Amino acid sequence: MTIKTKAELLNKWKPLLEGEGLPEIANSKQAIIAKIFENQEKDFQTAPEYKDEKIAQAFGSFLTEAEIGGDHGYNATNIAAGQTSGAVTQIGPAVMGMVRRAIPNLIAFDICGVQPMNSPTGQVFALRAVYGKDPIASGAKEAFHPMYGPDAMFSGQGAAKKFAALKASDTLEVGTIYTHFFQDTGTVYLQATEVKQIDTSANDAAKLDAEIKKQMEAGVLVEIAEGMATSIAELQEGFNGSTDNPWNEMGFRIDKQVIEAKSRQLKAAYSIELAQDLRAVHGMDADAELSGILATEIMLEINREVVDWINYSAQVGKSGMTLTPGSKAGVFDFQDPIDIRGARWAGESFKALLFQIDKEAVEIARQTGRGEGNFIIASRNVVNVLASVDTGISYAAQGLATGFNTDTTKSVFAGVLGGKYRVYIDQYAKQDYFTVGYKGPNEMDAGIYYAPYVALTPLRGSDPKNFQPVMGFKTRYGIGINPFAESAAQAPASRIQSGMPSILNSLGKNAYFRRVYVKGI
């Protein structure tokens, strides 16, 4: 089948995307939904289950936005208008209507990158610039890393001279240049200005980082970077017969992540007596009701999976550069005077929470190099706090939560906080928390990807023992992670690896999300 361009897909499916009376789909989502429609249509053309007469009859009275009485030949205008063309021959258009109704409501469209797959497997490629002549050497460090600064001596003095790495108990010599790798910012070069011994107890990375920062604050160590002398550069060019003076080199590598489609499936069985009585007493069709139940449950479960993966992979917030000294990492406690900065009343303590959210958003930008956090997933109580506080630079007012929707029977989208954060309610949160995340203007610019393959496949049969009707639904999709999500990994891993989240590549490592638990509300 010929691969259609984005414009061709939008033009083909425009009547269904923009059909009168259908829920509106934002312009930014239409190209993605059109691709999902195209994948669904491709499945119609090859799978026999869509031609099952009983399923077709059930669907004929099920969907109002794509109600059918016949085969529309996949004409998007007819599907959207509910026009019939004779006897029911297949249920493709009705399933398309279900997809049209359900898929755009997935929370994944707002907090994940959505990348429809053309086949059961997908690939994500990442180009990485690397220090050294062998890009795939073990431990080769990545350049242009948003979290770690450049090796500022690599093309300069560091090409001709190697500098000693600082360690516990070292005695500094005036004028000597040393090197150190900070856990949160990368390699630096430091020149000693006086004789001093490094603390002997600084025997792990965190303690050594703290000791060196202490000496920098005291002026004992000063950060420095220099180019090489002209005479050294000439020698490295092979000038005057010089040898064994190689240039420092850089290269690049292209890594691949593989994403595989997985499935969700549900079935329902009912008795003939139930179907007869339901039709006679209530005027309802058992197939139609169960179809709605199964399809809705699958979509709700995918929504939950997306939220769970984000929280699973989110870094521990209120840690590192976002931790207020003296407070507890990972937890914002309204009963802790350090967290609420000595607030006198509730409105002031609520504003302290806003500032913590801002700190987490800025940390996401520092680690990813893509942008500040721009959405929040939070428990009901936390959303109530955010809705009750004055977000302006003013006295800390506290009032009724009138600015946000906090009723999840209406929507899980609460509103926009301070003109910068889209806030979503986690209606099933087990304890109070908030997660700050980032999703950019295009679908590749996200920490996690939702990759639908075949949105919905209906199935029907009968139990061979009692002849009772059985119906089911399947959906196939993949979940992938951004190859640059683990910001702390400056040395790239293997060139071909799984792109699906797991305990090894995701747990607490995704720099696009930061989660903080909230206590004492």
Swiss-Prot record:
GO CC terms of this entry: viral capsid
Modification after translation (UniProt): A proteolytic cleavage by the prohead core protein protease gives rise to the mature major capsid protein during virus maturation.
Matches recorded under Pfam families: Gp23
Cross-referenced InterPro entries: CAPSID_Myoviridae, Gp23/Gp24_T4-like
Signal peptide location: none
Site (Cleavage): E65, A66
Keywords annotated in UniProt: Capsid protein, Late protein, Virion
Oligomer and partners: Homohexamer. Interacts with the portal protein. Interacts with the capsid vertex protein that forms pentamers. Interacts with hoc; one hoc molecule associates with each capsid hexamer. Interacts with soc; this interaction reinforces the capsid structure. A total of 960 subunits of the major capsid protein forms the 160 hexamers.
Function, in words: Major capsid protein that self-associates to form hexamers, building most of the capsid in association with pentons made of the capsid vertex protein and one dodecamer of the portal protein. The major capsid protein self-associates to form 160 hexamers, building most of the T=13 laevo capsid. Folding of major capsid protein requires the assistance of two chaperones, the host chaperone groL acting with the phage encoded gp23-specific chaperone, gp31. The capsid also contains two nonessential outer capsid proteins, Hoc and Soc, which decorate the capsid surface.
Name by which UniProt lists this protein: Major capsid protein
Organism whose genome encodes this protein: Escherichia phage AR1 (Bacteriophage AR1)
Organism lineage string: Viruses, Duplodnaviria, Heunggongvirae, Uroviricota, Caudoviricetes
